[in-house]
Amino acid sequence: LVLSGGHRLTSDFGTFVVPNISSDPDAGIGSWDIAAFSNAMLAGISPDGSHLYPSFPYGSYIRMSDQDVADLYAFMKTLPASDKTNAPHELKFPFSIRRLVGGWKFLFLNDDPRVQIANADDQVSRGQYLVEGPGHCGECHTPRDLLGGLKTDEWLAGAPNPEGKGVVPNITPGGP
């Protein structure tokens, strides 16, 4: 498994190019310490202090435990490095202004549960954690508003495929 990136994610905002997140210290994230990795995962902040675009699903990862983030960091450090340098994102104006992501975060970034479940036992709570956090299921299976925020009142109810081909299915218990 080499996490060299390069995949292009088409959206209404333009095209995001998946970065190299291999252990290469120059082209990848190999020079990041655990604090930098955690800050990216949980707050969407790069080591240089700039906002990461929410095409990286930190809006879900913010729900991950510190231990799970540390374990993921340790695992990724064991994977092969790649010196592949990827193209920059190709975003439409004004989405190309990275500073505006701070406003998006103000509106949409929080670690509240997406669904309130009364009297959930440990198994249900763990499943909710996996779906809402590391699994980041809602990032594709939930429709978005005009600013790219998740329509949480339609949580996991299916969404248009951002690449324009078909739909991402409804995965709610009452779905088709």
Task: Identify the residue ranges that each predicted region occupies.
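The canonical Cys-X-X-Cys-His
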Residues: 1, 37, 72, 127-130, ...
